[in-house]
Amino acid sequence: MRIAVIGGGPAGLYFAILMKRDFPSARVTVVERNRADDTFGFGVVFSDATLDTFQQADEPSYRAITRSFAYWDDIAIHLPARPGRDESGSVHRIGGNGFCGCSRRTLLLLLQERARGLGVELEFRREAAPEDFPDADLIVAADGINSPIRERWKAHFAPEVDLRPNRFAWMGSTRPFDAFTFFFKERPEGIFIAHCYQYEAGASTWVMETDPETFARAGLDGMGEAESARYLEDVFAEELAGHRLITNRSLWRRFPTIKCGRWVKDNVVLLGDAKATAHFSIGSGTKLAMEDAIGLHRAFLAGGSVATCLARYESGRREDVEKTQHAANVSLVWFEHVKRFWNFSATRFAFGVMTRSKAITWDNLELRAPEFVAETRRAFAEEARAAGLPADDAKPPMFQPFALRGMQLANRIVVSPMCMYSAEDGVPGDFHLAHYASRAVGGAGLIFTEMTCPAADARITPGCTGLWNDTQEAAWRRIVEFAHVHSEAKLCLQLGHAGRKGATKLMWDGIDQPLPEGGWPIISASPIPYFPHSQVPREMARADMDRVRDEFVAATLRAVRIGFDMLELHCAHGYLLASFLSPLTNIRTDEYGGTIANRLRYPLEVFRAMREVWPAGKPMSVRISATDWAEGGLSEEDCLAVARAFAEAGADLVDVSTGQTVADASPVYGRMYQLPWSDMIRNEAGIATMCVGNITTPDQVNTILAAGRADLVALARPHLTNPSFTLHAAAQYGVRDIACPPQYLWGKDALLRNAAREQADLKELRLKARPRSHAPEAQDLPRAAE
């Protein structure tokens, strides 16, 4: 086999090593445009888990690399003095992480040495293109982030480049470190961040980062390397401790997140940064590149033609790459919005740094650094106490109380509003009683009803619940009274109007599909059908607005009589009021269309009318779709304007959902995928939020709350299969005083006893499953700062 590798970085060299080792008869050539000892940047970082992977892939190169690594276990987070928050600044050292740093130049030289020893042909200071290797069976394009090969066949590889807004520059210093260190500094120009680690004796990396506004105010766009280094030496004078910054092509850049639709063209395959990048804030660029090499090598070990192996590589490797990129993207967004968290307590800020990428969570961090998690737990409880609530230092965040106006919740778990499509003529029946009652006694602090409609023609389907007559009112009262008598749960009525998404089939018969018969006329902000074959709604006239507003008010008065604890107005998911908010569904030219202020006009009118008749001591919330997941939809600025407007109108909480506005939306799903919008609204608009969306575990709930990204957490699907989700979570964390009906106490006691044993066993398994430490105690490796 003839293999040509274009690009002599870690990805290309490592692949050449693995292939020549296992296919010794193959002729493997690596061609690099730079000199053998040229490198840009300073150090690279690998975790213990990554080192495990390298050891399994190639023991000799692993041993050579680790002999040159500096190792550290802690992450240190330094915050400056912040007037009104931390007068003297703070430092958090959080252990249990296990990282190594190495000079990028040393890494390349060691990989070159290993490759030569195996018989790989290495050529430097040579530009190469695929046509230079007409007899090659395989051409590997490992030619970097600006890959000429990728750009040459751009139409085929279909790269997407997302140029992120923050500016960054790689610098170095002689200052030693014994931890991976984050320095956050505030100047009149703005906030600067330094990501620092030692990679060999007397050498450390300093990745400088700042937002575009601070970059411009500081004048860094007009400075050269030396001048910007001197400027940053002034910013980080205390942190540098007398050491100077070192430059090496330390140019200010914006990070390009690169994804490719295809990785393979004929016998050419993209590898490393040429096909996908991962942001430096999780230290995964070189890891991703070298693991690409391992994945491609394994594809060839499995046998078959070159085409078969390349297809196997792309299909088998893509998911792992996308997961790493997703974690990196979530992390980089946290740093882009660091101003959002600047007034957090030092403990909450540090917890946010640690959990920013979702790779580390509450339970995981408790294994790594139990003292820090205990501090976080105490700090969260103290915030609740400061709000006048009976908090308990021993409980995790999800079991701390929360209050909205005069309503106090026993915990922060919410049963999300979920349409059951099981009512007859809008009347909730026995199914609904069993559904809501079982979740109430299951321990959740707050239970939302499904979207309940204020009129018959406001329903999504014939099976939707309503609140427009006495029969419905009596049926809802039965449910609310049961919950109040037999549980500590509070109940929130969600009122909404389906608008253009009304008169459709039951979900299991065809979600959002129009009824073939028995439908009713529908209305919307504009006469735009949801699907091309959907019923065309009539554009609302002023008389329609008056009628619908009054129907909402009448339903609100019924909710008062029933005794609901809280009320929510549904302004999301493309339903009637949401259709006014989104520019995709509102093309009106009157005072209710156009600007966001105009688009808000009618939804706010309805909300204010409801708030006026709803008791002053009881809270109200609004559910919104914070993004439409479609081009031309609601912007972040619009979203914040919506949240602020409802807060000014008397909303106590924003229930943050996304999408379902238009049929051709392209949502990006994943764990906790709607959390960024809850975070943004809570910490920029300054209103309490409830997050929802693929949140499935108590661990995730605690992570979200402790990081200050939401105040309440709603779970839907987990409550469908486990009405006692909260009771089980209480047992998991040893919370004994969760409310439980006396009829169920024996079961609760057994659950608590069994959970204690199960959690001890689980902790032991998790500790055993952790990557083994590559610390120098076990090997002859240098410690960082030695």
Predicted stretch roles:
Residues 1-4, 8-73, 95-106, 285:
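Glycine-rich FAD cofactor-binding loop and adjacent beta-loop-alpha segment at the N-terminus
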Residues 29, 268-270, 447, 713:
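Residue-level marker for buried hydrophobic side chains located in beta-strands
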Residues 142-144, 278-279, 418, 717:
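Glycine-rich, N-terminal phosphate-binding loop of Rossmann-like dinucleotide-binding domains
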Residues 298-388:
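C-terminal helical "tail/cap" subdomain of flavin- and related membrane-associated enzymes
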